[in-house]
Regions:
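Domain-level signature for soluble enzymes in the chorismate/prephenate branch of the shikimate pathway
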Residues: 1-172
Length: 172
Protein backbone atom coordinates (compact mmCIF):
# COMPACT_ATOMS: atom_id res chain seq x y z
CA UNK A 1 0.00 0.00 0.00
CA UNK A 2 2.74 2.52 0.71
CA UNK A 3 6.49 2.77 0.45
CA UNK A 4 8.55 5.41 2.16
CA UNK A 5 12.10 6.18 3.09
CA UNK A 6 12.74 7.48 6.53
CA UNK A 7 15.89 8.51 8.23
CA UNK A 8 16.42 6.58 11.42
CA UNK A 9 18.96 8.24 13.65
CA UNK A 10 21.07 6.27 16.03
CA UNK A 11 21.19 8.13 19.31
CA UNK A 12 23.67 7.69 22.09
CA UNK A 13 24.56 9.62 25.19
CA UNK A 14 27.38 12.11 25.07
CA UNK A 15 30.68 10.58 24.00
CA UNK A 16 32.00 10.59 27.57
CA UNK A 17 28.96 8.78 28.91
CA UNK A 18 28.76 6.29 26.07
CA UNK A 19 32.39 5.22 26.43
CA UNK A 20 33.09 5.78 30.14
CA UNK A 21 34.24 2.41 31.56
CA UNK A 22 32.78 3.01 35.03
CA UNK A 23 29.37 4.35 34.02
CA UNK A 24 26.82 2.52 36.19
CA UNK A 25 24.71 -0.13 34.47
CA UNK A 26 26.07 0.83 31.04
CA UNK A 27 25.11 -1.91 28.62
CA UNK A 28 27.86 -1.79 25.98
CA UNK A 29 26.23 -3.94 23.31
CA UNK A 30 22.56 -3.09 23.83
CA UNK A 31 20.43 -0.84 21.60
CA UNK A 32 16.88 0.36 22.38
CA UNK A 33 14.22 0.84 19.72
CA UNK A 34 10.53 1.78 19.85
CA UNK A 35 8.11 -1.02 19.09
CA UNK A 36 7.84 -4.77 19.04
CA UNK A 37 10.44 -7.15 17.62
CA UNK A 38 10.15 -6.88 13.85
CA UNK A 39 9.44 -3.14 13.90
CA UNK A 40 10.97 -0.98 11.17
CA UNK A 41 13.22 0.66 13.78
CA UNK A 42 14.62 -2.75 14.68
CA UNK A 43 15.30 -3.37 10.99
CA UNK A 44 17.20 -0.07 10.83
CA UNK A 45 19.10 -1.06 13.99
CA UNK A 46 20.18 -4.37 12.44
CA UNK A 47 21.31 -2.67 9.26
CA UNK A 48 23.16 0.13 11.04
CA UNK A 49 25.01 -2.29 13.31
CA UNK A 50 25.34 -5.04 10.67
CA UNK A 51 29.04 -5.59 11.38
CA UNK A 52 28.63 -5.67 15.16
CA UNK A 53 26.87 -7.98 17.59
CA UNK A 54 24.24 -5.86 19.29
CA UNK A 55 21.30 -6.92 21.43
CA UNK A 56 18.07 -5.10 20.59
CA UNK A 57 15.68 -4.05 23.35
CA UNK A 58 12.08 -3.08 22.49
CA UNK A 59 10.57 0.00 24.16
CA UNK A 60 6.93 1.04 24.35
CA UNK A 61 7.57 4.66 23.39
CA UNK A 62 10.16 6.96 21.86
CA UNK A 63 10.60 8.59 25.29
CA UNK A 64 11.42 5.16 26.73
CA UNK A 65 14.24 4.85 24.15
CA UNK A 66 15.76 8.14 25.33
CA UNK A 67 15.37 7.25 29.00
CA UNK A 68 17.01 3.83 28.58
CA UNK A 69 20.09 5.50 27.07
CA UNK A 70 20.25 8.14 29.81
CA UNK A 71 19.86 5.52 32.54
CA UNK A 72 22.70 3.47 31.05
CA UNK A 73 20.42 0.49 30.43
CA UNK A 74 21.35 0.67 26.75
CA UNK A 75 24.36 2.18 25.05
CA UNK A 76 22.41 3.42 22.03
CA UNK A 77 18.85 4.15 20.99
CA UNK A 78 17.46 4.20 17.49
CA UNK A 79 14.58 6.48 16.52
CA UNK A 80 12.91 7.60 13.29
CA UNK A 81 13.39 11.26 12.40
CA UNK A 82 11.57 11.66 9.09
CA UNK A 83 10.04 9.83 6.16
CA UNK A 84 9.28 10.82 2.61
CA UNK A 85 5.50 10.32 2.78
CA UNK A 86 4.48 11.61 6.20
CA UNK A 87 7.29 14.07 6.89
CA UNK A 88 9.14 14.75 10.12
CA UNK A 89 8.53 12.81 13.31
CA UNK A 90 7.99 15.92 15.45
CA UNK A 91 7.81 13.98 18.70
CA UNK A 92 11.42 12.87 18.26
CA UNK A 93 12.65 16.36 17.44
CA UNK A 94 10.95 17.51 20.64
CA UNK A 95 12.59 14.69 22.61
CA UNK A 96 16.01 15.62 21.24
CA UNK A 97 15.43 19.13 22.64
CA UNK A 98 14.16 17.78 25.99
CA UNK A 99 17.16 15.47 26.40
CA UNK A 100 20.23 17.62 25.60
CA UNK A 101 22.62 14.88 26.80
CA UNK A 102 21.49 12.68 23.90
CA UNK A 103 23.31 13.21 20.62
CA UNK A 104 22.67 11.92 17.11
CA UNK A 105 25.76 9.94 16.17
CA UNK A 106 24.67 8.39 12.88
CA UNK A 107 21.82 7.70 10.51
CA UNK A 108 20.49 4.91 8.36
CA UNK A 109 18.02 5.30 5.53
CA UNK A 110 15.73 2.35 5.01
CA UNK A 111 12.91 1.68 2.62
CA UNK A 112 9.59 1.10 4.33
CA UNK A 113 7.08 -1.14 2.58
CA UNK A 114 3.77 -1.47 4.38
CA UNK A 115 1.51 -4.48 4.03
CA UNK A 116 -2.14 -4.91 4.87
CA UNK A 117 -2.06 -8.00 7.09
CA UNK A 118 -5.04 -10.00 8.24
CA UNK A 119 -6.46 -13.48 8.21
CA UNK A 120 -6.49 -15.17 4.79
CA UNK A 121 -10.23 -15.85 4.84
CA UNK A 122 -11.16 -12.17 5.33
CA UNK A 123 -11.78 -10.01 2.26
CA UNK A 124 -10.66 -6.39 2.30
CA UNK A 125 -14.28 -5.41 1.65
CA UNK A 126 -15.20 -6.95 5.03
CA UNK A 127 -12.68 -4.93 7.02
CA UNK A 128 -14.01 -2.36 9.47
CA UNK A 129 -10.70 -1.18 10.96
CA UNK A 130 -6.97 -0.98 10.22
CA UNK A 131 -4.55 -0.82 13.17
CA UNK A 132 -1.11 0.76 12.83
CA UNK A 133 1.28 3.30 14.29
CA UNK A 134 0.09 6.84 13.42
CA UNK A 135 3.08 7.22 11.09
CA UNK A 136 2.12 4.02 9.29
CA UNK A 137 -1.44 5.24 8.90
CA UNK A 138 -0.19 8.57 7.56
CA UNK A 139 2.15 6.84 5.12
CA UNK A 140 -0.70 4.68 3.82
CA UNK A 141 -3.33 7.44 3.75
CA UNK A 142 -3.61 7.51 -0.04
CA UNK A 143 -4.28 3.77 -0.16
CA UNK A 144 -6.69 3.87 2.79
CA UNK A 145 -8.59 6.80 1.26
CA UNK A 146 -9.84 4.27 -1.27
CA UNK A 147 -11.72 2.54 1.56
CA UNK A 148 -13.65 5.31 3.34
CA UNK A 149 -15.62 2.86 5.52
CA UNK A 150 -12.48 1.41 7.11
CA UNK A 151 -11.69 3.07 10.44
CA UNK A 152 -8.03 3.97 11.05
CA UNK A 153 -7.05 2.94 14.57
CA UNK A 154 -3.76 4.36 15.89
CA UNK A 155 -1.64 1.75 17.67
CA UNK A 156 1.71 2.16 19.44
CA UNK A 157 3.62 0.17 16.79
CA UNK A 158 3.11 -1.35 13.34
CA UNK A 159 4.56 -4.73 14.35
CA UNK A 160 2.62 -4.56 17.61
CA UNK A 161 -0.62 -4.05 15.71
CA UNK A 162 -0.04 -7.30 13.81
CA UNK A 163 0.54 -9.13 17.10
CA UNK A 164 -2.64 -7.55 18.50
CA UNK A 165 -4.73 -8.66 15.51
CA UNK A 166 -3.39 -12.22 15.80
CA UNK A 167 -3.85 -12.41 19.58
CA UNK A 168 -7.37 -10.99 19.55
CA UNK A 169 -8.26 -12.97 16.40
CA UNK A 170 -9.73 -9.82 14.87
CA UNK A 171 -11.39 -10.68 11.59
CA UNK A 172 -12.93 -7.32 10.81
Amino acid sequence: PGAARRVVSVCGGSAARATHPTAPNLAEDVVAFQGEPGAFSELALKRYFQNETMQSVPCESFRCVFESVLAGQTRFGIIPIENSLAGSIHENYDLLLQYPDINIIGEKKIRIIHNLIGFSDVAISDLKAVYSHPQGLAQCAKFLDGFPDIQRVPFYDTAGSVAHIAKEKKTD
